[in-house]
């Protein structure tokens, strides 16, 4: 429909067109904030988008305390973002993409492993720690789809 073409500067404007009304919509969640937005802007975006959304997908983080707090306070069901199996080198690279705070927390939590950059890491510990409060996980396949799929099958995480 050509009537909805326009200059959109945020996803909320796209959602408000009604074009996606027949789809389930997930919105971004930032348990540790964002390097690109202030906390108040993140809260404003969450409050504005929540009435149109069905669930929240969080950014990848290793901070289970921040995730637990976020899940408890979220206005919608939360799909917690975790990194699938990947080398430490790959995880450190992606941690940098989601913000300095995440990178520092990740490095602190994994300081003993930081020199073994080729070892494959999995999110099993994060999943086990959150499993009693979280029903849904979103797996970021930073280490590749094949490796992630094999891990999901091995751990029997498929439903």
Tell what function each PLM region has.
Residues 1, 29-33, 61-64, 82-88, ...:
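Active-site-proximal loop/turn and secondary-structure-junction residues that shape catalytic pockets
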Residues 1-40, 53, 111-115, 133-135, ...:
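Active-site beta->alpha loop and helix N-cap motifs at the rims of alpha/beta catalytic domains
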Residues 2-9, 55-70:
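Active-site glycine- and acidic-residue-rich loops that bind
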Residues 15-21, 47-50, 71-74, 128-132:
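Acidic (Asp/Glu)-rich catalytic clusters
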Residues 37-48, 119-129:
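Short, acidic/polar
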Residues 49-52, 80, 137:
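Conserved, mostly hydrophobic/aromatic
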Residues 68-73, 145-159:
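C-terminal helical cap(s) of enzyme catalytic domains, especially alpha/beta-barrels
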Residues 81-132:
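Catalytic-face loop-and-helix region of soluble metabolic enzyme cores
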